[in-house]
Regions:
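PLP-dependent aminotransferase class I/II
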Residues: 1-101
Length: 101
C-alpha cells in the first residue's frame, strides 16, 4: 500500500523521522489529519530546487525522479512517548484510508 523505509539485516535504525511514500500523499495526509493524526512533509522540495542551490543553475525538470519522490513523502508520528495504542490507531487509520479507495 505504501513504501516503507528499507532496513538491511545488519542495520539497527534509530529513526529521526518515519517517512512513507505514496502517490496519494496529500489525500492520505488530509485523511489522517481529520482523524487526529499529525503528519508532516519535512522535505517538500528536492535539493536542486531549494533557494540555497539556486546558484547551481538547476531548474524544475532537471531531476524528475527527485521531484516525483518529493511529492510522495509523508512523515508519520514517531517519538519515544508514542504508545502502542496510538501506533495501532495510526496503522488502523492508514488501512482504513486504503479500504475506502
Amino acid at each position: 500500500l505504501v513504501d516503507l523505509p528499507a532496513i538491511k539485516e545488519f542495520e539497527k535504525p534509530v529513526f529521526h523521522r518515519f517517512i512513507i511514500q505514496h502517490n496519494q500523499r496529500d489525500n492520505l495526509r488530509d485523511y489522517l489529519t481529520k482523524n487526529g493524526i499529525q503528519t508532516a512533509i519535512n522535505y517538500p522540495l528536492p535539493l536542486h530546487l531549494h533557494e540555497a542551490s539556486k546558484n547551481l543553475g538547476y531548474k524544475k525538470g532537471d531531476f524528475p525522479i527527485a521531484e516525483k519522490q518529493a511529492k510522495k513523502i509523508l512523515s508519520l508520528p514517531i517519538y519515544p512517548e508514542l504508545k502502542n495504542t496510538e501506533i495501532k490507531y495510526i496503522v488502523a487509520c492508514i488501512k482504513n484510508f486504503f479500504d475506502l479507495q
